[in-house]
């Protein structure tokens, strides 16, 4: 196994604008890190820099304690799995998996042993003589992973490998990737725009935005304690409710438009009188009663999802979404009385957007 270190790496195409701002990341031996963010945030560019397919403008990359910043891709000890399977259509599964080792001059016996072991791990034993056209999308992706596994790399790099699969296959392949990593324990860096993939696969998640690592943490950490408004709005489905307002002059309550006031769980006296953004996830809002101090919300629409429902309404000009139990189906125009637990409230600075 081998660790991976990015040390203040940057990328600029024109020498002026940095598409990757100075970024430092330490990936431990055997760790599975997922880089997630919207299109254009720099995650695939960063992955290609690690692979050696894009030059690093400044900073350094280390793999297995060796500086690889200027090394050719073939010398870095990495193997990539792409969104497109890139299999040779005229070759069998076995030949596709063996080809990279063959052109490196590895002996036939050793190649055969590695292909056999990778096929066993990926349950491709009975498909080795088939051509890619005879395989399903999931099987083709397994062959692409097998081609990477036989190289026995120090680091696996995954560039949105499940994007071409349908929803059912993506779920299946997520489970298979988890099992594969538990078995191989190879250091892995994985890129996706899909937060579900990020949360289910990662040991740690790096949320990227505009070439910046907004937050690096476990899936639980980025869900429970988002470091910024961007992370709060990106992680979670539906997204966290974000409500503009101000902390009252005593620092004890948060004041929203329309005269709605919510109690704060102490510790905010230093922010008294300041404009802030309050966040709460739809699943953390509970139904209450007017007599119990519930806050009213007139419901505009109801989304029935099956396992649960989403109620949509407004406080003034600000939208609010509440996740309801399956049996709760209020009608449009009805008033819901809500309880927002103090320990589930998040506050973000009104100017910087950072968590306070």
Curated annotation (Swiss-Prot):
Keywords (A to Z) from UniProt: ATP-binding, Cell inner membrane, Cell membrane, Membrane, Nucleotide-binding, Sugar transport, Translocase, Transport
Reaction catalysed by this enzyme: sn-glycerol 3-phosphate(out) + ATP + H2O = sn-glycerol 3-phosphate(in) + ADP + phosphate + H(+)
InterPro entries (UniProt xref): AAA+_ATPase, ABC_transporter-like_ATP-bd, ABC_transporter-like_CS, ABC_transpr_MalK-like, ABC_transpr_MalK/UgpC-like, Mo/tungstate-bd_C_term_dom, NA-bd_OB-fold, OB_MalK-like
Known function: Part of the ABC transporter complex UgpBAEC involved in sn-glycerol-3-phosphate (G3P) import. Responsible for energy coupling to the transport system.
Subunit details: The complex is composed of two ATP-binding proteins (UgpC), two transmembrane proteins (UgpA and UgpE) and a solute-binding protein (UgpB).
Family: Belongs to the ABC transporter superfamily. sn-glycerol-3-phosphate importer (TC 3.A.1.1.3) family.
Record protein name field: sn-glycerol-3-phosphate import ATP-binding protein UgpC
Positions bound to ATP: 37-44
Molecular function per GO: ABC-type glycerol-3-phosphate transporter activity; ATP binding; ATP hydrolysis activity
Entry keyword ATP-binding: yes
EC number per UniProt: 7.6.2.10
Domain ABC transporter: 4-235
Organism name: Escherichia coli O6:H1 (strain CFT073 / ATCC 700928 / UPEC)
Main location: membrane
Compartments where located: Cell inner membrane
GO cellular component: ATP-binding cassette (ABC) transporter complex, substrate-binding subunit-containing
A Gene Ontology biological process term: carbohydrate transport
Membrane topology recorded in Swiss-Prot or TrEMBL: Peripheral membrane protein
